[in-house]
Regions:
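Short, exposed beta-strand/loop patches in secreted or surface proteins that constitute
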Residues: 13, 17-25, 30, 249-252, ...
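Beta-sandwich interaction modules
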Residues: 10, 14-16, 41-56, 64-147
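Low-complexity basic/metal-binding stretches
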Residues: 331-332, 337-347, 353-398, 403-409, ...
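N-terminal/edge-of-domain interface segments
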Residues: 1, 38-41
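Active-site-adjacent structural segments surrounding the nucleophilic cysteine of cysteine proteases
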Residues: 126-128, 134-220, 395, 407
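Conserved active-site-adjacent core of cysteine acyl-enzyme catalytic domains
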Residues: 38, 204, 209-343
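Noncatalytic regulatory segments and standalone regulatory/sensor domains
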Residues: 3-19, 24, 29, 50-53, ...
Length: 445
């Protein structure tokens, strides 16, 4: 699928157009070739050369499964200055491998890589791209499988389109920084948004699990968007980075798919703006002021109940950087969870047991018998059990938290009110209520 400056490669027909070296296609995925029932130790796949509009920034994404003792490495090169640059690696990747982003420059000095973004240093920018993925294994019975490759560029002269106005709102779980593990820092905003995007489609994953799965060991942060897309791919969700305009965002919402968007704000005392990842969950129109607005989930809010916010469309277009992460509903059968920590990965268990007398009316009380010494804040996971099927709130306004004195808000909240009863489709069905006397707890897989 090609949308101007965004390129997404997936499926047998698309992958078959590239060059396969010790690599085979199996169920629409790139896997290592086999001989006598054993996988080869190394293989490589190279895409065709793609022409793109002149661009200054490039973001590459991949979705792959990599069992134990297997690994994936994605590389790219750019056509700039009437020649192809050298290959630039995004580092070796696997769910249980200590991922490290790379800051490097090509030998010819025409492009350089900072984390998840390739920048073209030539005056005319780049006009072509080519991707390559290397697969390797130390176990001849296991192979990595690459299901999606994508490349997104920011054009030098970006002719942005607005598309048709849209009045639609989608359900998206609310997570805020203050209610989750503070040791990840402010950059945990991206894991919060990614967890919300996956849990909207019925996944049951904590933001902390996403943070561990996409943590960049080079910077000890969770701000790498390429690792975020790869973590979502491990759970079976097609996910990729993109550079989107308003028309692209409206198309995603029209297709019942919330989007992770990056907006910038300025903080007093700092010269450079600060980027924040938010969840875009809809568009609307206010007849009272005759203005369009967008519906966002702001993870920097005071509490989970105040994450939902509204921003004027004109303000959003001024703050929106164009960077986005698209995630689609999984159409593949459930796979063993590669992200969840457990004793086999060196993680201690959280032992939960019921405490106190059985009080069905008052709920169940759980006590933590053991906590990891470095992570003493219990994750707070909020599913949508009380949300009607249409995604609307049950007939009552949200409780507004007290505003902290002197704290600057990430965006101007024009208003807060319950979602309308005629909200759009796409919310997950309500979960079945627990029967009295049962206790639910998360166990490691």
């Amino acid at each position: 699928m090609e949308q101007r400056n965004n390129l997404v490669l997936q499926g047998t027909e698309t992958f078959s157009r590239g060059a396969l070296d010790n690599v085979a296609l199996e169920s629409g995925a790139l896997v290592l070739d086999s001989s006598a029932g054993r996988y080869l130790p190394y293989g490589s796949y190279t895409t065709p050369e793609f022409a793109m509009p002149a661009f200054c920034n490039l973001n590459v994404s991949w979705n792959a499964s990599a069992p134990h003792n297997t690994m994936v490495e994605v590389r790219c090169r750019v056509y700039a200055g009437n020649t192809w640059t050298g290959w630039m690696s995004f580092g070796k990747w696997a769910p249980d491998y200590p991922r490290c982003s790379i800051n490097a420059q090509s030998e010819d000095g025409m492009i350089f890589l900072l984390g998840d973004t390739v920048t073209v240093a030539t005056p005319g920018g780049g006009t072509g791209i080519q991707l390559q993925v290397n697969l390797s294994t130390n176990d001849d019975k296991s192979t990595p499988a690459v299901r999606l490759l994508s490349a997104a560029v920011r054009p030098l002269t970006w002719e942005k389109h607005e598309g048709r106005p849209l009045n639609r709102r989608l359900y998206l779980p609310e997570y805020c920084l203050s209610a989750h593990d503070p040791s990840f820092g402010r950059e945990m905003d991206l894991p919060l948004v990614m967890a919300a995007l996956m849990n909207r489609w019925g996944e049951d994953i904590l933001p902390e699990e996403v943070a561990y799965a996409m943590e960049d060991n080079a910077t000890r942060s969770t701000g790498n968007a390429a690792f975020a897309a790869a973590a979502a791919g491990c759970c079976g969700f097609p996910c990729w980075q993109a550079w989107m305009d308003l028309q692209d965002l409206r198309t995603q919402i029209h297709d019942d798919c919330p989007v992770a968007v990056r907006v910038e704000r300025r903080i007093r005392g700092q010269r450079d703006p600060v980027g924040i990842w938010m969840g875009l969950r809809g568009f609307g129109h206010d007849d009272a002021v005759m203005a369009d607005y967008v519906l966002l989930n702001d993870p920097t809010a005071d509490s989970d109940g105040s994450v939902n916010c509204t921003m004027a469309l004109s303000d959003f277009l001024r703050y929106f950087t164009g960077r986005a992460i698209a995630l689609r509903c999984s159409r593949r059968p459930a796979q063993p969870r590669p992200l969840r920590p457990g004793p086999q990965r060196g993680w201690p268990l959280l032992l939960l047991r019921a405490a106190g007398p059985a009080r069905p009316a008052a709920g169940r009380f759980l006590r933590l018998d053991r906590l990891h010494p470095a992570r003493r804040h219990r994750p707070c996971h909020h599913g949508p059990p009380d949300v009607p099927p249409d995604g609307a709130h049950p007939g009552r306004g949200p409780v507004l938290p007290a505003r902290t004195a002197g704290r600057r808000r990430a965006v101007q909240r024009l208003r807060r009110r319950p979602d309308r009863p005629d909200a759009g489709r796409g919310s997950p069905p309500a979960r079945a209520a627990q029967t009295p006397g049962s206790t639910a707890c998360r166990t490691s897989e």
